[in-house]
Amino acid sequence: MTLRLWHHLKLRLSPEKATSVYELVDRPLVPVLSQMECLGIKVDRTVLARLSSEFAAQMELLEKEIHGLAGQPFTIGSPQQLGEILFGKMGYKGGKKGKSGQYSTDVTVLEDLAGQGIDIARKVLDWRQLAKLKSTYTDSLQQQIDPKTGRVHTSYSLVGAQTGRLSSTDPNLQNIPIRTENGRQIRDAFVAEPGNVILSADYSQIELRLAAHFADVEPLRDAFEKGEDIHARTALELFGEVNRDTRGRAKTINFSILYGISRWGLSKRLESTADEAQALIDAYFQRFPGISNYIQETMATVRECGHSTTLFGRKTWFPRITSPNQAERQGSERAAINAPIQGTSADIIKRAMVQMGPALKAAGLGHVKMLLQVHDELVFELPEADVAAASDVIRAIMAGAAEPLVKLTVPLGIEIGTGPSWGAAH
């Protein structure tokens, strides 16, 4: 069956202008991924067990506090009981019942309540986060350690994400949370063998760099060329000054714009009014008109052709871009704006992965092992004595991975860290 499909699909590669993506990116990546899956990464079971106990203790404390605020015990993990407590007994506004007759208590609802200063909602969000970390990671990962190797061996898929990004399963190592201290601690359980260290190499702000390339935004290109803090530069352009607050707001705006955020969405992230958020969006587009032009041109192309295209020729299709259903259409529009950027980023790191093994071997570093790929990051294991030499090779390959197929107008920055664990390497 696979061979029959290959004969059929091969005929479509050239007309779809996808030959280079297949021949130079995806096909040569298959043996690389196979080797990474076989290697796996060592996991320290004692770290996971300790974190599981700590999370359980934190959950127990939160449970007591939540029950105290509610005035009665109830099952926090039950959406039905939580909804009745919040909107029935406690009488908070904003409760909406679905077709099942139950109040919605999803993350959006709880974040809205927490944003109003409602303490119980914030504590439930914290409890849920801990429950997720405990069940999905600290407990589940212990069951997925191979008893023969002491390592976990994730499975990668080239077709798991629409934009060309890799996905992983059993376990999914792409979604380990890094925004919270508890989430970051989970990476401490991924460790090197005795005598080795973990090396993390991460593309720095690659999507913003690619946006500057796609949109031909000179101030942003100039900032990246000079190695400036891009969020500080945006803060200066929008607010006229740089401090912790303006830089934080500028960072939120930088990333939000690339995902086609609405003024309502941005107002929630900035905790501002919708009018204030719209004023910032307008100011951003006025200061960086190339971004606005890129968004408009991308939308026009996708509406006309039904797809977007990366710099390498990979197409992402959006069949619902003209849907009469507003929610479906707007969702496709937001995804279409970012797809060329995210897809190009995925193609670049795949190119780096294909070139990495031969380059390390040529430098006498064939024993350096590439273990994981997580979005814009590559994770290696190597002897500590080889860190300096390996870092030079890894940085060079990642920085030049787009060439000669694509000539970027912005440099690709690479951040490298090392340590006894994945967490310590950050």
Regions found by a protein language model. Give the residues of each.
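Conserved "right-hand" nucleotidyltransferase catalytic core of DNA-directed polymerases
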Residues: 1-179, 184, 195-197, 204-207, ...
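A structural signal for short secondary-structure junctions
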Residues: 191-194, 363-366, 371-375, 392, ...
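Metal-dependent catalytic core segments for phosphate chemistry
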Residues: 198-200, 207-241, 315, 319-329
